A protein has these predicted regions:
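Short glycine/acidic-rich loop motifs that flank beta-strands on beta-rich extracellular proteins
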Residues: 59-60, 97-101, 138-146, 151, ...
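Extracellular beta-strand-rich solenoid/capping regions of secreted or surface-exposed proteins
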Residues: 40, 57-87, 96-130, 138-160, ...
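Short, surface-exposed beta-strand/loop "edge" segments at domain boundaries and coil↔beta transitions
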Residues: 14-26, 118-122, 289-290, 360-361, ...
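Acidic glycine-/aspartate-rich tracts in secreted/extracellular proteins
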Residues: 53-54, 90-93
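Short N-terminal "domain-start" leader segments
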Residues: 1-8
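Right-handed parallel beta-helix
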Residues: 120-222
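All-beta strand scaffolds that present successive hydrophobic residues in beta-strands
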Residues: 50, 85-88, 124-129, 162-166, ...
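Acidic Gly/Asp/Thr-rich repetitive segments characteristic of extracellular carbohydrate-active
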Residues: 16-51, 56-57
């Protein structure tokens, strides 16, 4: 039995701790005070079970993310300075929903916020979140302002370790679905994201920002600005290995690896053919591999928006045994380095491409690949070698 339970009975939502009722509210009412009382009652390292039902929240709790008291966010469910394990009745069964009108210009919102109290305080050493749908009701929010960094349905911050996020759904977000961030305090280590679905998120469906030794598996993202975003930091050249993996991912949106060292992707199914402004599989700086994957975009879009890949700055990428289809296939610009082994590439604009409006010093090495369409579109200053 969980330490604290939340459930719906008759017309009421009820919270109990140790078998004793600690809070109640109308099912049709605002659940934010009841959930805060329930979370406060969970002991450190304890458990909270949320029963079947729809729970609707305002976002009244103001929380500054930066140490100087700036970067103010508003949230519905604050989980501060506490490691715990939260379990719902399952995706589509337990639904946590943002009430209408919570997000508006200048008012940045996260439905659930998990982190240390002050700017650089340590976060949890163990945390679990399972079996819940997060509903952002974005059609009932003010979307006049572009998504702000960190906004979303779940925002996790602070230097922390051993978080597990599985069997979750994030839908209709005004910004990100789930955002495992850091707010400058350091990485999340040994984080696991498994069996998560993101739908119709205005920013990233699934974001891992400055993570180490972490994994994403068996996840999907549909109708998001970016399906999966693995983010690093400007110190990538001296940071060492991040060791972040992603496998068995399905998405119709761009996938981005940004200043991440030692990323490893496999069994990716990315088809951006219907995305309005996708660059396909994008890598900036850092290094890593993608294997046994399908990377597709719209070959009729005669620009980088139709490209299956886009590697720039000082990215170093190995593609192995991938099916690549788009206007451009392997597209490497800036000072990037791309090596393609045993790939099947279809690209009318160039299976191997280094063209860019800016000067390039990029390199593409091809080995054992097949090409349908234009084989090479090379810009002066770049290098192409076939082995």
């Amino acid at each position: 039995m969980a330490d604290v339970e939340i459930y719906q009975s008759g017309s009421l939502t009820i919270a109990k701790a140790g078998g004793q009722q600690i809070a109640a509210c109308q099912i049709q009412g605002n659940a934010r005070a009841l959930f805060k009382a329930a979370i406060d009652a969970v002991p450190s390292g304890g458990s909270l079970n949320i029963g079947k039902g729809r729970y609707v929240f305002s976002a009244p709790y103001a929380f500054p993310l930066d140490p100087d008291g700036s970067n103010l966010f508003y949230c519905s469910i604050p989980i501060i300075d506490k490691g715990m394990h939260i379990t719902g009745a399952g995706v589509g069964q337990t639904i946590l929903q943002l009430a209408p009108g919570q997000r508006r210009e200048g008012r940045h919102v996260a439905l659930m916020l998990v982190r240390g109290k002050r700017g650089f305080d340590l976060g949890y050493s163990s945390f679990g979140l399972r079996g819940i749908t997060f509903e952002g009701a974005s059609s009932q929010q003010n979307l006049s302002e572009q998504p702000y960094d960190g906004e979303g349905l779940l925002l996790v911050g602070s230097q922390r370790s051993n978080g597990i996020f599985e069997n979750l759904e994030f839908r209709n977000s005004h910004a990100a679905g789930m955002y495992l961030g850091n707010n400058g305090s350091g990485p999340g280590t040994n984080e696991t994201v498994r069996n998560v679905i993101a739908r119709n998120c205005a920013a990233e469906g699934i974001m891992l920002d400055t993570n180490k030794g972490s994994s994403v598996s068996d996840c999907q993202a549909w109708g998001c600005r970016v399906g999966l975003f693995l983010n690093g930091n400007d110190d990538w050249q001296k940071r060492g290995s991040d060791n972040v993996t992603a496998t068995r991912i399905k998405t119709d949106s761009q996938i981005t690896c940004w200043q991440v060292n030692d990323f490893s992707l496999s069994q990716i199914e990315m088809d951006c053919s219907k995305a309005a402004s996708s660059y396909g599989f994008v890598v900036r700086d850092g290094n890593g591999t993608i294997k046994n994957s399908v990377l597709k975009s719209d070959p009729t879009k005669a620009s980088s928006y139709g490209g299956a890949t886009y590697f720039y700055e000082q990215a170093r990428v190995l593609l192995e045994a991938c099916q690549i289809e788009g206007y451009f296939g392997v597209h490497a610009v800036g000072k990037s380095y791309a090596e393609a082994k045993d790939c099947n590439i279809t690209a009318p604009g160039g299976c191997f491409c280094t063209t860019d409006p800016n000067p390039v010093q990029s390199t593409i090495i091809a080995q054992g690949c097949t090409c349908s369409g234009l084989k090479k579109a090379l810009q002066s200053g770049s290098t192409f070698e076939e082995r």
